[in-house]
């Protein structure tokens, strides 16, 4: 293959160009690959190779680029050196000319002339998509018109600022100093001048006790010829309108229509915080000053005049070198399927028959296989007959014809017509039958995990296969990938976006399902695909949607054709609230709550109670009952009455109840189960929510026996994503839960809002799958008429930081320019906010390109600030804990609580730390311990402690995924090892975790006043959230050791409350949770509102924060330097550890602490498992209990090595348990197995105690502690130099001992060493052995050790990456059963 590189070099040489190769290592140490990209100037395409060695990677990249040159007719295919045949360019239409001009890339409209923006585009684009693959930057459809003006003006201003050598305070002038106070007046002035009638449109959200408002407005700007839009949220109408005006004014400012605010900004004086006296020991102050000197930092002297305070923060000490500004608008590279490329792993196929097979050969084999299967498999024939009956079948020929002739096609079909499962199969089977199987690979996106998995399993069943052959799926934490050619992969949109970094290579068709849902990822993907279609007209995009108005999508994709698929025609009769009351003769129960006085909502409530509007055709009783129901509440009693009414109809069928959010589902489930009628065997009540485990989710599809009614309580997940065939009745609350975010005050609100008419139409369609159905809408007809037609796109109500990072990672050009091309572009102020946040985090450099830190953050599926916190956690060797806390923030709390406040059983998890985050960490640690004893123990633990097991399992998955990404980015594994934390006594590692948390959640800082009352930024009032461990019971007052807290998010209800709170010391705030620190010599001011009484010199040592940030810069460039930091940096880190201790600020956590109920925690033994189930030394996971081949001893999970009982009693049958007796893992005299004994024999010290000692070994004569030295001491290795191995005799675990004569280098936190001793392997004989770091992948060179039947849900290999056994495999123990 080498001559392909020479061919490309020669071709470029003739044109006076040189190919530029860029190569980097990817994957983990055990299966390292090399990714190579080759670019040639003037071509907007990167050839890619991903192989096991550098040479092949370069050759494959060169071949990919040459194939691209063939496709765009720059090179003739017969000139290309052989080996792997280049597929001919796919034929677009009947024309023989395969040169695709841009005009052909824009499919012809379905009738009538081209609309003006497209006619202009076609003219501009005639030179279009040639060598560059994209055309000039000019001809992008100017949806976000005039954004270019903003960016070009911004560049001029940057140049001017540089000339004046003026340090600009970016934040103050970020939006022209326009604030909530001054924006509305300026907007009104603008309206008067331009003679605009500006009216706010208000929507009320939430129930009465928690009411808030959304204000929105669209205005047309004459001088720019475009509209701008704002939609903001506030606790009353006045605030919502002010926020909406602020967004509009900021956008007008950025577009150059209005000036910056030049008056004095009047800040509302918040409540003053009294100066807090900080006690700092002289020793620590001296240590601080020494570090500052060592780091060569300058301390600002105190001011001469106290009324002129000085700023103590110093600027950044280290910057990333600015990379070259990317001027070309990027596009994600695409190439058709090729012979030796696997699109699902984005790598070349280097070995096996497929590495050298031609596309013709592959196509022939697959056709023969399908033909044989059709003839022989009788089940398949009956499934085919079922498929024939689906409504979409009649449209098969029309769909295939449209897809063949157009780059983009929209298929619109009623729910249940079969489009999701059938369209991909029609395309695939068409290619296979026409001898083009190797030219077809289809990716299908779904908005949710449950639908991606359920649809993939259904399609595999219809093809007579298991997932993993022609059909597979990939969702976060779980994948079964299909074969590399002629296959369909179902995935979530998020997973596809992560795969885009390697391009859409080897994929012939991209199908985007449920486009009407308008989540932020789908909207982002549509912009990417639109650009891809312009650059590569041969790609095929199919957009699928429910029966809604698709005009907007059709125009966005150049007036592409729409195919209408009609569904099964079982009618669905719909009823509204007044009908439901009349039918059931429902009388609402008397209200037991006294109504609170209405707070001032800032104006008239125009969102009238529609329950007072009832037509004359209904009786007076109905009108009265209806008027007594509160529109904002979900009437459980009426749902109950409807279920009883359904019983009387004697029409069997499942009932699907749509409810907004998990809380209502859980409450409704308990409400029904506690009712003697619905809790009986005649009913099966099933919840359906994205957060419940897959096994639970699957139950909703299972049929129930005769005489049993299945009632499914679901969120909008069942609206479009999945189809439950036996549903006949739908009861619809007509509501859904949305997350609203307001940027200017960093406020989150989870509001229950009315669903849109489109949503209600979808929900209605779920009934009537098998027979005529019934839909009961729990809203009045009057309310229905007032509903919005569509929901607001998520892009308008969520921060854009993560999407902005993805844009830069995929090299798609400027963030603003890219988002301006969205189907509905987000407001400009939100884009600028995101760019600014990323610059502050050092994720973007001076040219707005990704820094090495930004590149790591872009790969982590988590909020960028948390990502940086995780990197800092790795530097301090507490990476695992920080990853756990970050993962836990992605999910609801695991506590199952009846009331709003947590009970003692949950508060206990916080120990003495006054911290919700520590409670989460402790819960996770305790659950992780419990599950080591098997699944039954895990279930028992969760029931006893009232914890949601599903949430804990998903947190584990997310944590492991985050750690894997960091390890693959080059971070040493030993900085991510699991540690044991104590929440009841001193623990410096936990102190450091809390310091880093203060950085991660900044600017969310608050000060406790009394009872639940706290002050947040700028002294504004708020409350401790009732779900916090810090929330006092009833009205009792609480005294905390420190009044300062950091918190996860501000939730706006009637009041503003802080959720997820952790107590911090003032020194932790000073160091990690501050932006502006000033001193007048006596008092230090943090961010203009917190005042500390601390010496100027001590406070000035805040400057070491800059040194810490500089270290993050260096570590991001080269993560492996963490394990060999220079003494100055080590000294700085140790000083930060000291500052993080509560005692450093004179705070005693034991004071004021109330310990509830359970008494002190028993001592724990150390764990070094990398979170992967390889725990408690050697017995817990992997090969100690059930794992590989059933483990060593008999016994169950932890029965392992000895014959003894379970976890505590095991390992050495008699005598103490695992860490009982004289001490645990690394403590004093005792060894691993307690007392004086070794693991299962006599002898001296054990694992970490003493020096290894004599004869007693793991399984007999030689072994673990044998030979010269012990664990890390002196000459001997892990198992000493002796002959015995793990299982005695010569063969044993590692032949010549665990690490041969290597020794075991031990630095404070590192356990690195080579585990692959001499001759013996795991089962003797093989030459491999455990050759890797202590908590990583355990794979010997010659064989891997997966339990034969085990594996994560049966798939083999821990988390499908071969981490020691499985994760609750089939047998939890015994031979071949799996285990951890």
Swiss-Prot record:
Phosphoserine found at: 127, 136, 323, 451, 508
Span(s) of short sequence motif DEAH box: 513-516
Start and end residues of each stretch annotated as OB-fold: 960-1076
Residues bearing PTM Asymmetric dimethylarginine: 1167, 1312, 1323, 1339, 1346, 1353, 1361, 1372
Subcellular location: Nucleus; Nucleus, Nucleoplasm; Nucleus, Nucleolus; Cytoplasm
Modification(s) after translation: Methylated. PRMT1-mediated methylation of undefined Arg residues in the nuclear transport domain (NTD) is required for nuclear import of DHX9.
UniProt keyword annotation of Nucleus present: yes
Region: Interaction with CREBBP, residue numbers: 1-252
Similarity-based family: Belongs to the DEAD box helicase family. DEAH subfamily.
Record's comment describing the protein's domains: DRBM domains cooperate for the binding to nucleic acid but not for unwinding helicase activity. The helicase-associated domain-2 (HA2) region is essential for the duplex RNA unwinding helicase activity. The minimal transactivation region (MTAD) mediates interaction with the RNA polymerase II holoenzyme and stimulates transcriptional activation in a CREB-dependent manner. The oligonucleotide- or oligosaccharide-binding (OB-fold) and the repeated arginine and glycine-glycine (RGG) regions are dispensable for both RNA-binding and unwinding helicase activities.
The protein's name in its UniProt record: ATP-dependent RNA helicase A
Organism for this UniProt entry: Mus musculus
């Amino acid at each position: 293959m080498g001559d392909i590189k020479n061919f490309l070099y020669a071709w470029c040489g003739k044109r006076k160009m040189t190919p530029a190769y860029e190569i980097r290592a990817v994957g983990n140490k055990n299966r390292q690959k090399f990714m190579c990209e080759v670019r040639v100037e003037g071509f907007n395409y990167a050839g890619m190779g991903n192989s096991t060695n550098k040479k092949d990677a370069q050759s494959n990249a060169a071949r990919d680029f040459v194939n691209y040159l063939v496709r765009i007719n720059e090179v003739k295919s017969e000139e290309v050196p052989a080996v792997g045949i280049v597929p001919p360019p796919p034929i677009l239409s009947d024309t023989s000319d395969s040169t695709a001009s841009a005009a052909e890339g824009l499919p012809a409209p379905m009738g009538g002339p081209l609309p003006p923006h497209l006619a202009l585009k076609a003219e501009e684009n005639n030179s279009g998509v040639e060598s560059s693959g994209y055309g000039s930057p000019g001809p992008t459809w100017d949806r976000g018109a005039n954004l270019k003006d903003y960016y070009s003006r911004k560049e001029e201003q940057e140049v001017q600022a540089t000339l004046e050598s003026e340090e600009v305070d970016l934040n103050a002038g970020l939006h022209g100093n326009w604030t909530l106070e001054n924006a509305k007046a300026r907007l009104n002035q603008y309206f008067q001048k331009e003679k605009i009638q500006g009216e706010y449109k208000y929507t009320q959200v939430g129930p009465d006790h928690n009411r808030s408002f959304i204000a929105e407005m669209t205005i047309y700007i004459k001088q720019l010829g475009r509209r701008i839009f704002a939609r903001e949220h506030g606790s009353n109408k006045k605030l919502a309108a002010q926020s909406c005006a602020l967004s509009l004014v900021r956008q007008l400012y950025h577009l150059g229509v209005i000036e910056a605010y030049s008056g004095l900004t009047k800040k509302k004086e918040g409540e003053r915080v009294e100066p807090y006296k900080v006690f700092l020991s002289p020793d620590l102050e001296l240590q601080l000053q020494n570090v500052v000197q060592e780091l060569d930092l300058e301390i600002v002297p105190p001011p001469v005049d106290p009324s002129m305070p000085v700023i103590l923060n110093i600027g950044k000490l280290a910057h990333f070198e600015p990379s070259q500004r990317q001027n070309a608008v990027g596009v994600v590279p695409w190439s058709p399927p090729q012979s030796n490329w696997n699109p699902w792993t984005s790598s070349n196929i280097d070995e096996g028959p497929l590495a050298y097979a031609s596309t013709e050969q592959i196509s022939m084999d697959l056709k023969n296989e399908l033909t044989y299967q059709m003839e022989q498999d009788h089940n398949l024939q009956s499934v085919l007959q079922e498929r024939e009956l689906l409504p979409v079948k009649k449209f098969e020929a029309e769909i295939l014809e449209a897809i063949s002739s157009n780059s983009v096609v929209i298929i619109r079909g009623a729910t249940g017509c079969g489009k999701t499962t059938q369209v991909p199969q029609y395309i695939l089977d068409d290619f296979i039958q026409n001898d083009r199987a190797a030219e077809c690979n289809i990716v299908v996106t779904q908005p949710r995990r449950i639908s991606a998995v359920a649809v993939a399993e259904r399609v595999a069943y219809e093809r007579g296969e298991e997932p993993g052959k022609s059909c597979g799926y990939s969702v976060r934490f779980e994948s079964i990938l299909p074969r590399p050619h002629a296959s369909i992969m179902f995935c979530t949109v998020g997973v596809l976006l992560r795969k885009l970094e390697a391009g859409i290579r080897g994929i012939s068709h991209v199908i985007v399902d449920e486009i009407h849902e308008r989540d932020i990822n789908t909207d982002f993907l549509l912009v990417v695909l639109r650009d891809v279609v312009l650059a590569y007209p041969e790609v095929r995009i199919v957009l699928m949607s429910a029966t809604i108005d698709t005009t907007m999508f059709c125009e966005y994709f150049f007036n592409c054709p729409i195919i209408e698929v009609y569904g099964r025609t079982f009618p669905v009769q719909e009823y509204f609230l007044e009908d439901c009351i009349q039918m059931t003769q429902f009388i609402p129960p008397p209200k037991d709550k006294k109504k609170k006085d209405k707070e001032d909502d800032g104006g008239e409530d125009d969102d009238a109670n529609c329950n007072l509007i009832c037509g004359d055709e209904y009786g007076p009783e109905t009108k009265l009952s209806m008027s007594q129901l509160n529109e904002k509440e979900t009437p459980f009693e009426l749902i109950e009455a409807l279920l009883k009414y359904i019983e009387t109809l004697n029409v069997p069928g499942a009932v699907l109840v749509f409810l907004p959010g998990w809380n209502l589902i859980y409450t409704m489930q308990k409400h029904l189960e506690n009712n003697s009628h619905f809790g009986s065997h005649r009913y099966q009540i099933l919840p359906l929510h994205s957060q419940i485990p897959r096994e639970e989710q699957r139950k909703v599809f299972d049929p129930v026996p005769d005489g049993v009614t299945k009632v499914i309580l679901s969120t909008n997940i069942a609206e479009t994503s999945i189809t439950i065939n036996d549903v006949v009745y739908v009861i619809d609350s007509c509501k859904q839960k949305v997350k609203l975010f307001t940027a200017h005050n960093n406020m989150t609100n989870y509001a229950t809002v009315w669903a849109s008419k489109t949503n209600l139409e979808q929900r209605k369609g779920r009934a009537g799958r098998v027979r005529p159905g019934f839909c009961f809408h729990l809203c009045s007809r009057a309310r229905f008429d007032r509903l919005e037609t569509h929901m607001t796109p998520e892009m308008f109500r969520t921060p854009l930081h993560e999407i902005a990072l993805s844009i830069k990672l995929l090299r798609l050009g400027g963030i603003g320019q890219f988002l301006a091309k969205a189907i509905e572009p987000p407001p400009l102020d939100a884009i600028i906010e995101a760019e600014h946040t990323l610059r502050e985090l050092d994720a973007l450099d001076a040219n707005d390109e990704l820094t090495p830190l930004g590149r790591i953050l872009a790969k982590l599926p988590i909020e960028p600030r948390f990502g940086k916190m995780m990197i800092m956690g790795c530097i301090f060797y507490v990476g695992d804990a920080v990853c756990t806390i970050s993962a836990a923030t992605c999910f609801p709390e695991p506590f199952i609580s009846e009331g709003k406040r947590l009970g003692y059983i949950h508060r206990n998890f916080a120990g003495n730390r006054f911290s919700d985050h520590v409670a989460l960490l402790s819960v996770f640690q305790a659950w992780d311990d419990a599950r080591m004893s098997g699944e039954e123990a895990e279930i028992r633990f969760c029931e006893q402690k009232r914890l949601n097991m599903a949430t804990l399992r998903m947190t584990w998955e997310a944590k492991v995924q985050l750690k894997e990404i960091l390890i693959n980015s080059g971070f040493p594994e030993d900085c991510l090892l699991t540690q044991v934390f104590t929440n009841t006594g001193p623990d410096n590692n936990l102190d450091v975790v809390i310091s880093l948390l203060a950085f991660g959640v900044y600017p969310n800082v608050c000060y406790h006043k009394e009872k639940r009352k706290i002050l947040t930024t700028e002294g504004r009032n708020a409350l401790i959230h009732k779900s916090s461990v810090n929330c006092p019971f009833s009205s009792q007052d609480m005294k905390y050791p420190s009044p300062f807290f950091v918190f996860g998010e501000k939730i706006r209800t009637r009041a503003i409350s802080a959720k997820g709170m952790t107590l911090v010391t003032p020194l932790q705030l000073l160091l990690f949770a501050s932006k502006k620190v000033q001193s007048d010599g006596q008092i230090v001011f943090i961010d203009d509102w917190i005042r500390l009484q601390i010496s100027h010199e001590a406070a000035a040592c805040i400057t070491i924060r800059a040194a810490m940030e500089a270290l993050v810069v260096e570590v991001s460039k080269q993560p492996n330097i963490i394990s060999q930091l220079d003494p100055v940096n080590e000294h700085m880190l140790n000083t930060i550890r000291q500052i993080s201790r509560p005692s450093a600020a004179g705070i005693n956590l034991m004071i004021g602490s109330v310990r509830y109920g359970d008494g002190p925690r028993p001592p724990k033994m150390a764990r070094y498992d990398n979170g992967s189930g390889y725990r408690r030394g050697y017995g817990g996971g992997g090969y100690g209990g059930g794992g590989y081949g059933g483990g060593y001893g008999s016994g169950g999970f932890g029965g392992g090595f000895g014959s003894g009982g379970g976890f505590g009693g095991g390992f050495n049958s008699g005598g103490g348990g695992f860490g009982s007796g004289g001490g645990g893992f690394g403590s004093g005299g005792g060894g691993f197995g307690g007392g004086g004994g070794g693991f299962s024999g006599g002898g001296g010290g054990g694992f970490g105690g003493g020096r290894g000692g004599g004869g007693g070994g793991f399984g007999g004569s030689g072994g673990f502690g044998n030979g010269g030295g012990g664990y890390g001491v002196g000459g001997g290795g892990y198992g000493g130099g002796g002959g015995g191995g793990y299982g005695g005799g010569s063969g044993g675990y590692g032949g010549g001992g665990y690490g041969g004569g290597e020794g075991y280098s031990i630095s404070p936190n590192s356990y690195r060493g080579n585990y692959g001793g001499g001759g013996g392997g795991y089962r003797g004989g093989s030459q491999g052995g455990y050759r890797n770091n202590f908590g990583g992948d355990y794979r010997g060179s010659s064989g891997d050790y997966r339990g034969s039947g085990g594996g994560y849900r049966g798939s083999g290999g821990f988390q499908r990456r071969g981490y020691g056994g499985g994760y609750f495999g089939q047998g939890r123990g015994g031979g071949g059963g799996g285990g951890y």
